[in-house]
Every structure is written in C-alpha cells, then in structure tokens.
C-alpha cells in the first residue's frame, strides 16, 4: 500500500504503517512511506 507520508528513512514509516494499515512493516521509497500487510 502506498501512502502520502513523506520520509527519509524506513524507520519513520513503521509507526505510520501500524496506524494506517495495522502492520509494522514499512519502507521509505521515493521519499514516501510504503506499507506491506
């Protein structure tokens, strides 16, 4: 799943993904957070 959350490191996305998609797996791609379920 793609998000509109900007990021610089994948670590920033973990809590975002947990909130949005209830998954703790996320990566920073092209300066945006991307979540995996």
Swiss-Prot record:
GO terms for cellular component: extracellular region. The record marks 27 as: Basic residue of the functional dyad. The modification Pyrrolidone carboxylic acid is found at residue 1. One of its GO terms (biological process) is killing of cells of another organism. Pfam families: Toxin_2. Disulfide bonds join 7-28, 13-33, 17-35. The record marks 36 as: Aromatic residue of the functional dyad. Expressed by the venom gland. Has the structural arrangement of an alpha-helix connected to a beta-sheet by disulfide bonds (CSalpha/beta). Belongs to the short scorpion toxin superfamily. Potassium channel inhibitor family. Alpha-KTx 01 subfamily. Potent selective inhibitor of high conductance (maxi-K), different medium and small conductance calcium-activated potassium channels (KCa1.1/KCNMA1 and others), as well as a voltage-dependent potassium channel (Kv1.3/KCNA3>Kv1.2/KCNA2>Kv1.6/KCNA3>>Shaker/Sh). It blocks channel activity by a simple bimolecular inhibition process. This is Potassium channel toxin alpha-KTx 1.13. It comes from Leiurus hebraeus. The lineage of its organism: Eukaryota, Metazoa, Ecdysozoa, Arthropoda, Chelicerata.
